[in-house]
């Protein structure tokens, strides 16, 4: 199975869209045309450690942001509902590389807070990956 940043975004977007099909999921800031309520998926600072034999340990920070119209009556109620959904369903989340096979990926250090009437649900994905060596076909 291939582990990639784009597929992490796609897998998380799939989880959110399954529960909230009417809420668009964006992976980059939209200046115009954003439809509320919606989710944004961003990577936070992440680290990669090199290990033996083309293996790497990757620690990806992820921030799922839920945005709705400002100053809604009972606006925090929806934020709390989504935070509870993520608490229950995110660990582990079903990761797919597009081949049709799902692999459960655990998450770590889950935390959420409300900033400026937006939910920030943050967590880490810690995984070991192996990069295939490329053979140099050039000969002297």
State each model region's role:
Residues 31, 39, 106-108:
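Intrinsically disordered, low-complexity segments enriched in proline/serine/threonine
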Residues 35-44:
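A short, hydrophobic beta-strand-centered structural micro-motif
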Residues 1-26, 47-140:
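Charged, amphipathic alpha-helical segments and their flanking helix caps
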Residues 26-35:
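Short acidic low-complexity segments
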């Amino acid at each position: 199975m291939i582990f990639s940043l784009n597929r992490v975004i796609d897998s998380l977007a799939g989880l959110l869209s399954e529960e909230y099909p009417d809420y668009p999921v964006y992976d980059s800031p939209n200046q115009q045309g954003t439809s509320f309520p919606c989710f944004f998926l961003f990577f936070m600072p992440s680290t990669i450690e090199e290990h033996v034999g083309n293996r790497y340990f990757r620690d990806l920070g992820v921030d799922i942001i839920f945005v709705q119209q400002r100053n809604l009556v009972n606006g925090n109620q929806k934020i709390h509902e989504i935070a509870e959904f993520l608490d229950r369903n995110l660990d582990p989340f079903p990761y797919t590389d597009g081949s049709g096979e799902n692999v459960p990926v655990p998450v770590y250090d889950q935390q959420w807070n409300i900033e400026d009437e937006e939910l920030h649900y943050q967590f880490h994905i810690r995984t070991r990956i192996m990069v295939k060596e490329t053979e140099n076909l050039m000969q002297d």
